[in-house]
Amino acid sequence: MSVSKRSALGLVRTSVGEQAVWALVGEGSLRHMTASCITTLELEALPVDRAEVSSYVADVMSGLEAYSSRCAETPGGASWLYVQHVPVRRLITQLVRKLLALSAWPEFAAAPGPVALAPYEGLLGLRDSSSREYRAYTVTWSGVAYALGAQASHNPARSARLRQLTTLHPVRDLAHAPTPSAVSTAEVVALSWSSRHAQTLLPVLEQLAREGRPSVLVDLATDPMERCPTPAGGSITLCSAPLEALTAAGTVPGLHLDTEEPTGADGTVQVGVHTVRLDRLERLAAALLEGSGGCTQPSWRAVVRVEEWFLELLAAVRPHTVLLSNDTSPLGALAAHAAERHGATTVTVQHGAWIPEAVAWPALHSRHIVVMGDRDVAPAREWVRHPKAEIHVLGQPRFDALAGLGREAQHRYLQNLLGAGNESGPERIAVWACQPFGPQRLQAQADIILDGLRRARGRWGLVIAPHPAQGGRVFNRLLRRDGEPRMAVADPRVGARGCLAGADAVVSVSSTCGIEAVLLDVPVLELDRPGDRTLGLAEHAAAHRCRTAVDVAAALDLVSRGSARVPREACDAVCRWRGHSAADVAQLIIRRAEPDIAPTDLIDHQPAGAESGFPWGEGETIR
């Protein structure tokens, strides 16, 4: 989990001719400077206001939308900025954070001015991430200077590190993807490109199969560990998009990658004291979309080819419903647009907890939105884009498997990992449900957890459960530590879901596994460090809020004495789950496909056991 503490560049006040400028220079030269200077690493460590970042990001995206959204469209009519909104918005967020950090430095704030870039530095780069596939793109500091108007005659669009990355290739099975015309007709087409999607959607498709409703599950995962398992029975057809569609790379026709306005006067947007050129942002976005970063960040050319294949599939299968568990990232937004064009109803099932301040794009495009808990209704209502959208509180189909978990078997698995059961082994075991944060962030979280475990009464052990998208090697440095507490890393194929039922406590920052632990009545410690965003479980009295190691130790001591059960109302706020969410979603799909069901045929809150709009149990629909 180690990461370099050095910064390659620094910022120094200098002059070009008679004009004072802030120049990016090699960090080593700062030691001899008498003028105001700072390393870029120090700049990036300056605190910025989250709300201010979000507000400016929204302003920049609105400006870019007006300036450029129709410069490129798919053959099906989807704007490039609609489909690629999430990766572009994330890039803009990095830019805005750096601009606000620059303004937060007192020396620059006292004398703001133009920034001169570092020659030959790429304009786009990568941040450190523990994710196995996801690429954490960023705007370099030279890219920041470029966005503000600096000339970049000798700067490549991509950094050397980014240029060295090869296009991710899907597993070999995708090379034998069926032609759309070979797929039989079905009532529902579902799309998945991660294991969480598959775990959310497959239970629904299996329930539909029991009702005699055939479906097609399209697997778009480019990471072998994220592929869909082969469905049982013959009512669910599993197919994949062709290899060349998912890995295509190339320029974006219509976007100005090689040409720009001489002064950028045709479009600018303000970020505090900084004037950002929209033509430069368009060029940065075009460079970002040239390369394919897998199913989560497909190139523009990959998007166009996937759309063509998917529209052919819809024409052959003729479904009444397209089922998704993400309709905002590129493939999800594309599928929602294609489904609407085809005339199919769109249903999105929330597959993970929402943190309103941290969502990549606060938008939902589907006709029907299935959310987990009562607290998810308000953000869903704010984010819906469909003019006839309905919101349904039906829990989480992926959680239905919790009812059959073997607690004793999972507890034995944890004990075996830690060598528990002997005199020197731990008396109790905590599971840390990890997420693919950057190395420094994970290290800071680990320090608090381990210190808290050491301070707690009794002997606690820790099992680190990697996120499905996370590489296991990131934890090697932690495991080299000597002494207490005893630690181990769960098999990535097991993950937190495969062992949390056997834990004495679960530690989480914002993992959905924290919600699963609440539903299983396993005590949850919600790590609430400065700079981290949590699921807010503690706000509903569903978890112990832990800001420091002392808080962690105190919470573990409460667990040792026997924590009180989480009230039903608190559970429902987080996830209204009764063990049959998949059946409820399946019934929603069936009912909404029937032409005689009026859109006002809503489902109200009802006590358990009472008759409901869904024969399978409770639920609520909000328009």
Explain the meaning of each model-derived region:
Residues 1-623:
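Catalytic-core helical/loop segments in enzymes performing group transfer/polymerization on anionic/lipid-linked
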